[in-house]
Amino acid sequence: IETAEMEKALTERRALEPDMAHRIARIANGNWNLALEELDAGNENRQHLDMFIMLMRLAYMRKIGDLKKWTDVIATFGREKQKRMLDYFMHMLRESFMYNFRNPELSYMTQDEENFAKNFARFINEANIIDISNLFEDSKRMISQNANAKIVFFDMALKIIVLLLRK
């Protein structure tokens, strides 16, 4: 489905505001089911966003004890959910980097994601994006290979502390 058609359908059928309909249509990329999933308030992506925000804030503040607690929470998720969460983290990393270019056509974020990215994006730059992306990819691979989730996520959190400081 074309983005404009989906926007119109979301506005008419779901009574969304035009700006919200535009965002969801862009994120869904022609997939009506994905658009409806985005509208669901209990969306898994909302939980992933909360976990991403918590990770980045705790890493920035260097709160090792709280990062350990964050890791313990993540370890209770199933492996497939952990992998989906890491995919979401990679999505947020890309979107935060693209936000730095100040071109809305490059960005595919919900309003909540953009609210976080407008303050967070300055910490994602050319000096650290590749290493952070590789870190998320490696963590996903290790989880897929049945590694201990607590060790993988705590190691990842500690490395994020160092990588966020790169300018």
Predicted regions and their residues:
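Charged, glycine-rich active-site and insertion segments that engage polyanionic ligands
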Residues: 1-88, 92, 99-106, 111-167
